[in-house]
């Protein structure tokens, strides 16, 4: 299962990307996370359906300093995994 997830609210400047990277690594997911200039955080998760769904649930909560006002997720194409850094299962990417 591959899902593209976008979180909106107080999600930048609160450790959200580090939280996502830590949790996704713990769930053995592949993918990436990045800030967007519009103030949202975007992440791609690839792995077993139960692990991806667990990660999406964690994103709804976020780290303690965050407030997720909205979360959208959609099916993603495997080509989007290519955005991560070579040799990494899960990457934090630059802002777009």
Curated annotation (Swiss-Prot):
InterPro entries: Acylphosphatase, Acylphosphatase-like_dom, Acylphosphatase-like_dom_sf, Acylphosphatase_CS. PROSITE patterns: ACYLPHOSPHATASE_2, ACYLPHOSPHATASE_3. It catalyses: an acyl phosphate + H2O = a carboxylate + phosphate + H(+). Keywords: Hydrolase. SUPFAM superfamilies: Acylphosphatase/BLUF domain-like. GO terms for molecular function: acylphosphatase activity. It comes from the Bacteria. It is an enzyme of class 3 (hydrolase). The keyword Hydrolase applies. Residues 2-94 form the Acylphosphatase-like domain. Its EC number is 3.6.1.7. The keyword Ion transport does not apply. The active site is at 17, 35. PANTHER family: ACYLPHOSPHATASE. Belongs to the acylphosphatase family. This is Acylphosphatase. The lineage of its organism: Bacteria, Pseudomonadati, Pseudomonadota, Alphaproteobacteria, Hyphomicrobiales.
């Amino acid at each position: 299962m591959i899902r593209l997830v976008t979180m909106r609210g107080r999600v930048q400047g609160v450790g959200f990307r580090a939280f996502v990277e830590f949790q996704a690594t713990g769930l053995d997911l592949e993918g990436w996370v990045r800030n967007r200039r519009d103030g949202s955080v975007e992440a791609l998760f690839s792995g077993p359906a139960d692990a991806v769904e667990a990660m999406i649930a964690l994103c709804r909560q976020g780290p303690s300093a965050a407030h997720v006002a909205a979360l959208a997720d959609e099916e993603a194409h495997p080509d989007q995994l290519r955005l991560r850094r070579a040799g990494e299962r899960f990457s934090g990417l630059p802002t777009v």
